[in-house]
Amino acid sequence: MTESYLRMVPTTCQPAKARDNTRLGGTRVEDRMEVFLERYRKQPPAYIIELEKTAREEQVPIIRRATRDILGYMLRTKKPENVLEVGTAIGYSALYMKENIPKTSRLTTVEKVEMRLVKARENIARYDKDKQVTLLEGDAAEVLKELAETGKKYDFIFMDAAKGQYLNFLPWIMEVLTCGGVLVTDNILHEGDILESRYGVTRRDRTIHGRMREYLQALKDMPELDTICLPLGDGLTISTKMC
């Protein structure tokens, strides 16, 4: 996404209105849009498509196609040297991002859930032929703290981990994000729950609901960040660190 385009988009992070779920012929409007736009979408490598299919079948949460498209476009145009992903899952998004950065660039991804780590290790070993991806195992907060304390810097960060922890991760994210670097945060709409009042969501989701709103407010209020919110996929923010 070019700078000229980004500056045309309002920097507010107020929740957008819920999408129109009007059904036409039994299918939601956005579903029909997805089918239509698929024919014009830049297709990823065959193994990425296969990983996506496997994840859907096994109900492993991965980034949605609209989010994937934005990530790919931004990475191809920005050409970051060092990319950090918080939340690896099975390695789908890490490998997709790897396909869209220069061969000389490096990508570090963090995951702590052992079940996902098993598949992530397998997929990265199999498909990362150029050895661009480094998988760090452990709690994201602890790993981020260590990265910051050892002086690591990243010019592109993708956050797709535990939604209720985004706000806790933010200070460390700011430490490792370079001046002019970009932070992309996924799932900010939390399946639409974020649009509801606190009492409009289930009790078990209220903590995440509140913390996500606090996180969005923090992004909006930080003078060192220029942030936009986009209602794509499950919602995402794009923040640039201004220095």
What would you call each of these model-derived segments?
Residues 1-156, 163-184, 188-243:
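A short alpha-helical cap/connector motif
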